[in-house]
Amino acid sequence: KGSASRTPTRRAAAAAANRSTSDFSGCFTAMAMLSAFELFGLPEKFAIDLDQLEKAHERAILKVHPDRFAGRPAAERRVAEQWSARINESFDVLRDPVKRASLLCETAGHPVDAETNTRMPADFLMEQMAWREDLDGAKDESAREAVRDKARAKFAECESKLESAIDAEKDWTKAVDLTRRLMFIGRFLEQTSAKSSPML
């Protein structure tokens, strides 16, 4: 569901969401109709500008900052809190490549279903087992970091393939498989080092 297919109702919702925060009539309903991408004015694609996302988040969250609603009616403060929660939730989804890819797959009608479908190709699982064995056998932190570097390289490779599968090919079967691989590798990095992050 790209921005090109946005209906008049969704265009009206986008316009309402960009009005002054003093206009609360129907604003939360309008916001609820927007996708995470539309909320920040970004194209619905995997390859997004993270700096642009960061700046859009800062602008959006400033509009609902508690200081702007000091002394305002309780109803307005509650709406501002709802806006803030939705803005932060959408930001967390879009800045995480796994969550972003999962959202795009689901929007296209191809949910990743990571919680219910845990089957992965044997060669992929063997690679993960080899990484863990190498970590267990590593004699120093330098050797362990070398293993994590392999995982980070594989994570970056999956990200690149996802960009092609989603943004260029629209191959959702491939995109779902790559998203699940990205999820497994990211989990490996999180589990093996508190300082390691697939986002880096």
Please name every model-derived segment.
Residues 1-3:
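Low-complexity, intrinsically disordered Ser/Thr/Pro- and acidic-rich segments
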Residues 12, 18-200:
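C-terminal accessory/regulatory regions appended to core domains
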Residues 5-7:
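Intrinsic low-complexity, disordered N-terminal segments enriched in polar/charged/small residues
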